[in-house]
A protein has these predicted regions:
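A short, N-terminal "cap"/entry segment at the start of jelly-roll beta-barrel domains
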Residues: 1-47, 108-162
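Conserved short histidine dyad/triad with adjacent acidic residue
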Residues: 20-21, 33-40, 50-67, 153-154, ...
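A short hydrophobic beta-strand segment most commonly corresponding to one strand
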Residues: 53, 94, 106-123, 162, ...
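Short acidic-glycine-tyrosine-enriched beta hairpin
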Residues: 82-100, 200-216
Length: 243
């Protein structure tokens, strides 16, 4: 696509949005210094989550409090510290509601993905606590028995958890087994590879760096294409009775 000719792969529809790097416009976040935040998904779309992609260097800092929200942080590239804990590429951290955070860049170039939503308490269950990890330590499992489509689950599944964050890896030619149509909302970022994504009744080529918002009940399906596996990280809301 040639942006000088007014061409772009960015698409905004009622039930989904495809946000590609050629259309990124930086924002300014209170408490964040010497960094470049991009708001990929927010309530302005009608979404129930926010998704940010933040570029940092060794002079970058971000401080604040989660208040009533929960944050999931994933290091796409580089390394950084979250409340004193060093996270390298593939590292992640979960920040519960009412948590103070201090984030410091620790490499010349780092990229941080953030999923954020309002936490929904569940009677009889404690709010999940702060934790960190790295996706290299998380085992892959075949998705519905397909060894060519594999999931890594980054947030332990428990009744208290109201969000899931997973990494999906597809070998070339692998697909979702059917067109999914469900109540869960998705926010996602392609980490590597690419393919074709069906969103509602439309088809879109997708590649590393692309972000997608998928509203509840929007039909979706994906096929990986190209010489390397396709990988994306995605959010969905879970474990609560829909209204």
């Amino acid at each position: 696509m040639n942006p000088k000719l007014g061409l772009t792969r960015n698409v905004l529809k009622r039930n989904y949005a495809l946000i590609t790097p050629d259309g990124y416009v930086p924002s300014v976040f209170p408490g964040w210094k010497n960094c470049t935040p991009i708001v990929l998904i927010s309530a302005a779309l009608g979404a129930g989550l926010s998704q940010y992609l933040i570029s940092l260097d060794t002079n970058s800092t971000g401080t604040g409090q989660t208040e009533g929200d929960e944050w999931f942080l994933y290091v796409v590239t580089g390394k950084l510290k979250v409340n004193g804990t060093m996270l390298t590429a593939g590292g992640f951290a979960f920040l519960p509601p009412q948590t103070k955070y201090e984030i410091r860049g620790a490499a010349k170039v780092s990229s941080l993905l953030v999923f954020r939503k309002t936490y929904e308490p569940l009677a009889g269950h404690k709010t999940p606590e702060f934790f960190t990890g790295n996706e290299r330590d998380v085992a892959e499992t075949p998705f519905l028995g397909d060894k060519h489509a594999r999931l890594k689950t980054l947030i332990p599944d428990s009744p208290a958890a109201d969000m899931a964050v997973n990494i999906f890896t597809y070998d070339p030619g692998a697909t979702l087994p059917f067109v999914e149509t469900h109540v869960m909302e998705h926010g996602m970022l392609f980490l590597s590879g690419g393919g074709a994504y069906r969103l509602d009744a439309d088809w879109h080529p997708v590649t590393a760096g692309d972000a997608i918002w998928i509203a509840p009940y929007c039909p979706q399906w994906f096929i990986a294409a190209g010489p390397e596996p396709a990988r994306y990280i995605y959010y969905k809301n879970v474990n609560r009775l829909p209204r």
